[in-house]
Amino acid sequence: MKITYCDALIIGGGLAGLRASIACKQKGLNTIVLSLVPVRRSHSAAAQGGMQASLANAKKSEGDNEDLHFLDTVKGSDWGCDQQVARMFVTTAPKAIRELASWGVPWTRIKKGDRPAVVNGEHVTITERDDRHGYILSRDFGGTKKWRTCFTADATGHTMLYAVANEALHHKVDIQDRKDMLAFIHHDNKCYGAVVRDLITGEISAYVSKGTLLATGGYGRVYKHTTNAVICDGAGAASALETGVAKLGNMEAVQFHPTALVPSGILMTEGCRGDGGVLRDKFGRRFMPAYEPEKKELASRDVVSRRILEHIQKGYGAKSPYGDHVWLDIAILGRNHVEKNLRDVRDIAMTFAGIDPADSKEQTKDNMQGVPANEPEYGQAMAKQKGWIPIKPMQHYSMGGVRTNPKGETHLKGLFCAGEAACWDLHGFNRLGGNSVSEAVVAGMIIGDYFASHCLEAQIEINTQKVEAFIKESQDYMHFLLHNEGKEDVYEIRERMKEVMDEKVGVFREGKRLEEALKELQELYARSKNICVKNKVLHNNPELEDAYRTKKMLKLALCITQGALLRTESRGAHTRIDYPKRDDEKWLNRTLASWPSAEQDMPTIEYEELDVMKMEISPDFRGYGKKGNFIPHPKKEERDAEILKTILELEKLGKDRIEVQHALMPFELQEKYKARNMRLEDEEVRARGEHLYSFNVHELLDQHNANLKGEHHE
């Protein structure tokens, strides 16, 4: 039996895995990266819109800093995130942007003077300062106070992935693709690597290491309609679950992106709306201002997705053979802007829908027939233009994943996890656009460093016989799938699983339908034990891969559905129509799913409390819908009083915002990442003789005063 030894084993070759591999090589470790596909084909490349980091370079970004990025991230998560992790993230993100620039990422840059833009559906002129010429530009994204999303046109993930992959090659990281991880090797609650199948030859071997880091991405493919690549089936997270030790966090927290192309499901980046694109119904009306007067199309993703579906349910969706949808109008931006800044969107729309989204020519006025006369709140009807893109919400991102602590350590010692595969828990119950590729790189930096330090100190304490036993177990299972007498067809089971998840565990959830989904998923899981593969070869066999992966996917589907059924509240992307309020009194916690015994047919669910008394910002009104639509935590007022007292005391002592923040909620982070981020406007504040950052203390004070006055509810 073949066994390969190394110091650091990284499973997954996207942004998080590759960046972590660089951290390992920088410490002199023998590092191997295993990837299902050539690493430049990883799903990280599909990210279009940008990466959030509070640089505050551009006109519309002035005044931005870590505090505002932190506040947006916490509010976006619907107070479901780990606030210490959010602080680690926002502090490191500006450093990550500049590191990527030094590695060759061609960030779109500021050009001094006037530039045209579309803001809130109106054509405006933005004047960039002469002294900011050449600095990194940022665009608007949903759920943010400032324009914070740095970008390279609409191919940000692609350029980032190529730069990080090149840097990994520069450091001579051993990257091996077409490798499929089947199971983790573990003994006495410690992980020592993985059993791996070569997709081309079918050979099953072991990679034994001092430390293992999982970075295999999300689990979107358990749904039928998703923007995710075919490799995003969550098999890595499921393998962690199958150890019986590692746990999955917040699996019911599934994001549905508002603007997926109909019918293909390919993402139409949030940059379309960030740059000024609008959503229209079948009558051509811009309907989002009626639902979200402040943020409109740039409300958080979970909010926009719900509003689109609510509007469609009212009968205002455009008809198509693939179901009702609404329109995304970016022709309003002008052809020059679309072809320069949204060229990938244009290519995708033309290739997969036959639509030139820059075409503002009138196609028909027939769509305006029957427009209600008594609904001025939805705006004016408009003739259908040729360039409008058909879109509707589809599964997009996995907030849940393998539960880790802030250092990336899972419940299984020696196993780390980073990126979308992890529940680090930066995103809570809703992720902000632009925080995903940002998290992938930042987690690769922070967790990669902690992982490398672990590998430097750890020892391999497992004998060859135990490793060979893991190899044999996987070999026997492959033989069973190829030669058992079962009659079940893998594709029939997989397709029905996806349909159940789409139909009953989607944007809107309800107890009875979740119970129905759970029952059917259990039946499918039982059937998956009797799958027999028709193609009998071990090598180059996609049917075999689907067979062993489908059983893992069903375990994840059960975790998602069980978590959604038990969580009797609505929080972020988890919307229960039978429990419409966010309930901080009962549900300010994190769901943990485990599978301690292979004989189980359902996950074990437990909960991890989020401690209000350790939060920098206590749970409050998120800013969408009715103000009273949440049940406050009983300790909220006590924590608010503590926060206010601390701010007032430190302000009297002349402390700046960073010192105030540290007093409110200390967090651990490597010194090189925790160092202060300097911005151009910092020097201007100093030049005026003002107290650096003091204006943010007042802003925070105003916020907490409002909380104490009861302005967080009606």
UniProtKB/Swiss-Prot annotation:
Q: Which UniProt keywords apply?
A: Cell inner membrane, Cell membrane, Electron transport, FAD, Flavoprotein, Membrane, Oxidoreductase, Transport
Query: Could you tell me the superkingdom of the organism this chain comes from?
Result: Bacteria
PROSITE patterns registered for this protein in UniProt: FRD_SDH_FAD_BINDING (PS00504)
Q: What's the record's note on cofactor binding?
A: Binds 1 FAD covalently per subunit.
Q: How does it sit in the membrane?
A: Peripheral membrane protein
Which GO BP terms apply? anaerobic respiration
Tell me the function of this protein. Answer: The fumarate reductase enzyme complex is required for fumarate respiration.
Q: How does it assemble?
A: Part of an enzyme complex containing three subunits: a flavoprotein (frdA), an iron-sulfur protein (frdB), and diheme cytochrome b (frdC).
Q: What is this protein called?
A: Fumarate reductase flavoprotein subunit
